[in-house]
Amino acid sequence: DLTGNINSYLPQVDRLLLWDNTPGGGKEQLPLSGVTHPERLEYRGCGRNVGIGTALNDAVAYAREHGYTHLLTLDQDSYFLPGAFPDYMAAIRSYGEEKRVIFSVNYFIKSQQAPLYPVADRVDEVSSAMTSGTVYPVGLFEELDVFMEELFVWGIDCEYCWRAARKGVR
């Protein structure tokens, strides 16, 4: 349920860019009746499947242009359990949102019916983060450059985290 997924975090974000990667698609609005803050939605796309790197880099450019400090990336099938997104944002603020850190959630792996890491009420350092649910300080893109579009889909998230780690980003 795309509307339900979006509503799990939309009340706490300033803007949500919805990228349509459908060949022949574009910037048409999706049928999202029931979205809590439709005024926060912006539809983007280019009418062809360009992979997630191009979409992510479009979001980076948008964040820079509009003065945002952080970028949250999500897949269409991602959602937060009730209360989890505000807790995630509070954990980022408590840890230090101004730090050179890429923040990531602890993923629940549906096929294994278990979280990726042991559940704990703390921030742990990990070697890489999946794209969905990750929060990037926008300033890191000045330092590290943008996502590697030529990877298309697979490995974009890991490559960026590894590049960041080589530069001392946690």
Model-found features: residue ranges?
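Glycine-rich, basic loop-to-helix element that forms the pyrophosphate-binding segment
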Residues: 46-63
